[in-house]
Amino acid sequence: MLFVELVVQGLVYGCMYAMMAVGLTLVYGLLRILHIAHAGVFALGAYMTVTVANATGSLALGFLVATVVSAIAGIAIYRLAYQPILHHAAFVPMVVSIGLFIVMQEAFRLIFGAYGIAFDKNPWYVAHVNLVGINLTYVEIAMVIMSVVLLVGFGLFAGLTRAGIGWRATVTDPHMATSFGVDPVRVRYVNFLFGSALAGIAGGLVGLLNNYVEPTMGGAVSYKALAIVVLGGLGSVRGTLIASLVLGVVEAFGAIYLANIFDRDAIGFLFLIVVLMVRPQGLLGRG
């Protein structure tokens, strides 16, 4: 039973990692930019969720506002920070992204305080259900359901709709896609809108899971998301999804059997190092 419980716990965290890391993969696949500021959007979504939920008593409204604000923030980051420097050397957008993330962290500290905000009412934090002997909180169940629905929805969008096929074509060969009438600028906006909305929702869910939100909460998650993107193969959405779930399960087992040696985050990065020693291109990256 412990084995099954650890697998389930790992998959739950893997779903959360996937919601965060997919946005990074989408941006890298399209623009070849390591979008570090994505972690700031994650924290922004968490703050919007807790602020609106505490003010109105409605978690649903909190998530709705977080999704919209995060999506708008993502589009603004692309339009104001990335679009003017797309033709610069590759390190320039990365430096800008890191600087923007630091600015966002400090802004959260100034606006919301340095010690974080707790949810006034969070019944999901303690309420749980028992599934075949495994206790799961409502937050964990919601995390799995929302991540599956959103990621499957994105897969259907990318595979079945004209806009989704245009997005895939732009990622594969932007010049060829443009010659067939695909607007690359519109594709980039959709890319940032969807990826940022996912990050905002993930931030709200992690805030619920921890029952509080703090200015630096995006830091550790951003490092983990970057590790997942590399582990899955840079630019591979499918690789990112698989790497997220695998890393979640590895961390769950490591937190039990290696707790006296490594903490949970260290286990994840150790696993990344081992995999990259064997497959430098990542799980599904091209050699």
Language-model region placement:
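Inter-helical junctions in multi-pass inner-membrane proteins, predominant
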Residues: 1-16, 157-162, 191-229, 252-265
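Membrane-interfacial amphipathic/re-entrant helices at transmembrane-helix boundaries
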Residues: 1-20, 48, 59-62, 88-94, ...
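Membrane-embedded helix boundary and interhelical linker motif in transport proteins
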Residues: 8, 30-76, 80
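Short, non-helical or kinked segments that cap or interrupt transmembrane helices
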Residues: 15, 24-46, 87-92, 163-166, ...
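Alpha-helical transmembrane segments within multi-pass membrane transporters and channels
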Residues: 57-101, 107, 242-247, 251, ...
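Hydrophobic alpha-helical transmembrane segments of polytopic membrane proteins
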Residues: 70, 224-247, 251, 270-278
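Transmembrane helix-bundle core of multi-pass membrane transporters
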Residues: 84-160, 187-190, 211, 256, ...
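Helix-loop-helix "hairpin" substructures at the membrane interface of multi-pass membrane proteins
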Residues: 132-213, 237-242
